[in-house]
Amino acid sequence: MFDKEYSFKGSHAERVNRLTAKFDDKNQLFKRNLDVYIMAPIVGFLYQRKAEANIGDGTQTKIFLEQLIKNRDDLAFNYRLIMLLDKKNAPQIDERVDKAFRLFNSDKAEADEALYDQYVLGGVDILYEKLMVSA
């Protein structure tokens, strides 16, 4: 995980573009797509909001591999934090520890990585709703 370029697609790409756009000469909410990607899974998990990827009109915005590699420690921390706190999908602490550490970045973590991505997209939706729509 976090070892290949990441793409937001469809409505989520549009929302990330709006969240990273400058709204005057000096100010913007998030400087980079990566900043949204770091914040979104935490917000999605806290609000228990998951979303599925959609293609929409084909809009796409990317986070390049170099950025992911440079921030891999922070991204892995977020992933592990969510796996450790997610009692809904893994009620036993031993199972959550396995998901966070032993299974991280293995073939057995595919479902957990998909869940993490759903929290990322749900978090993008929440950030957009709270910061852009209500503003």
Enumerate the predicted regions with their spans.
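Short, basic amphipathic alpha-helical segments that act as recognition/interaction helices
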Residues: 28-55
